[in-house]
Amino acid sequence: YQSKPLSPMWRKVNSWGQFLQFITILPFATIASLTDLAGPIITSKEFGSITEGFKQLAATIKNRQEAAQFARDIGIVTNETVANAWVTEAEQDYMDPKVRKMSDAYFRVIGLNFFTNFTREFAAGMGVQFITKHARNEFNNPRSERYLRELGLTREDVLTWIQNGRRMTTPEGQKVKQGLQRFVESSILRPNAAERPVWASDPHWALVWQLKQYFYSYQKVILGGVKREALTRLMESPNTPIRATVGIFALTAVATMPLAMLGLELREYAKNGLAWLLPGVESGPKYFRSDRMDWPEYVTEIYDRSGFHGAMAIPMMAGQAADFGKSPVFTLLGPTAETVDEAFSNGWRVDRTLKDRLLPIYNQL
């Protein structure tokens, strides 16, 4: 695709098509991203990190300026508009400049930029707690040395860094900085070309690939990290495989699923509130869908929203579309193709297409 640059016309089509899907599909993206807070807890690899996560979350909120400055100091947050789990910097670079500004503004308005930076600041704080805890190793954790080694650190590096006032300018400080960067990159989704198929980097396919990046990145970064840790523990304790691996799997579930539950609840309250606020729709019990679910259905819903299917979520969504009488092909071809398909299916019922697909917020209610 580098030998065949994107034509100006196709660039505009891609840009406006993507922007339309941003404003119609992602108004609740910040709420849906709450599960991102589980990443640093999972990467901390021990059940005690759940308690530490609550403490660090409170500390990040309370000392926001300090947390933000530390994140900038180690290079995981910049003052520029950030990419998020739903759209990468590379995808933004191929957008029409006017549409990109509008997209950036939209993500600021819905709070996604703020939340993306906040999760990175939280992850940086969790990283400091992680390396400090395992450098001191007060409870003689046999895995502590390995945990630090995986970040390119030793116990001596971290303790010397602490004794020197946690300055990043010392040789140990530079190693700690790189180690914390590795921790954050293993905790927070920051999609890039390495986390998607080769064809997905071609801007000609932007409308087909749109909104699929999250599932690939979650599988590679979070689920891949869990898998690697489980395999390592299996090699360390081959005679007790269940005991060796159950902890990391349980931690992943316990850290993620309550956040998915909270996200679903907040989404339903947000929809109900908007229905009360906006003309033409009424608030009511219909927006609290989870209240009508039985336990198996609710657990399945939360499992889906936790992201545990990874990239398999894409063909599964296509299968669900087929169950509802829609074409799974258009689901695989992306939300823009689904919009076109729905418009043709509705024909002259333009009002239905507007309400169900094209009117931001209303199409979610």
What are these regions (language model features)?
Residues T30-F70, I74, T78, V82-A90, ...:
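Small-residue-rich, membrane-active alpha-helical segments
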